[in-house]
A protein has these predicted regions:
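Flanking scaffold residues of small Cys/His-coordinated metal-binding clusters
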Residues: 215
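Local cysteine-cluster metal-coordination motifs and their immediate loop/turn environment
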Residues: 218-219
Length: 219
């Protein structure tokens, strides 16, 4: 299955949602840059986010456009670290402390620049914090890369859910309850769920409407 992302709304426009499957483009990036497993996981998470919102980060850089084209590189592609306390790739340790900068060129005289500190280095949590503090948009960001023992990419993808201004307390509560019970995004992908199925699982009871599907690729 080729990589792609979808855009959707739910709860009569009170929720905006994006979901993507990015295994092929993350594997392409891994092979192109000869990255270690933890570097692949870090870069892959940000590449996945880039297909949905286009960030740029020092040391780990991704650029993306509205057509689903994305590219990126790692400042230290050979970084190797032991697993974290949960036995997972230590992406937070590899990314370290720093600043997340998001630069958006939307056709104005100057690009929009938003910047926040890295709160964890796990990337999804950092982007959630960025949306809340820099863009004042309550969001849930989930990103994941699952590696094979042969250092190839088994699964990659993610989703972004955002509450729109004026979202009701009922919608907020329902979304929070659903998010709390979700499996990791790589587990959902490894079970054969595509982006549509993932958003259906999260927002199917809230009037999910899929707006469009966009192919994504490393370029």
């Amino acid at each position: 299955m080729s990589d792609y992302m979808i855009r959707a709304t739910a709860a009569e426009g009170q929720i905006r949602a994006f979901a993507a499957t990015t295994k092929e483009l993350v594997e392409y990036a891994r092979a192109a840059h000869n990255t270690s497993p933890v570097a692949t996981a870090a870069l892959g998470r940000l590449l996945t986010a880039g297909t949905m919102m286009g960030p740029m980060m020092q040391g780990l850089t991704v650029t993306a456009d509205s057509q689903g084209n994305v590219k990126g590189y790692v400042g230290n592609p050979e970084v190797m670290l032991p697993p974290n306390a949960k036995g997972k790739l230590d992406v937070a340790g590899a990314v370290g402390i720093g600043v997340l900068s998001v630069i958006k060129d939307i056709g104005l005289k100057e690009p929009y620049v938003g910047q926040t500190i890295l709160v964890s280095g796990e990337i999804a949590e950092d982007l959630t914090y960025y949306y809340a503090t820099s863009e004042q948009t309550p969001s849930c960001v989930a990103l994941g890369v699952l590696m094979n023992k042969t250092n190839t990419v088994r699964q990659a993808g993610g989703f972004i859910l955002q509450l729109m201004p004026g979202a009701s307390e009922e919608v907020v509560s329902a979304l929070e309850t659903k998010i709390a019970s979700l499996a990791p995004v790589t587990s959902m992908l490894d079970q054969g769920m595509n982006p549509e199925a993932i958003l259906q699982d999260i927002l199917g009871d809230m009037g999910l409407e899929i707006m469009d599907q966009i192919p994504v690729q490393f370029h």
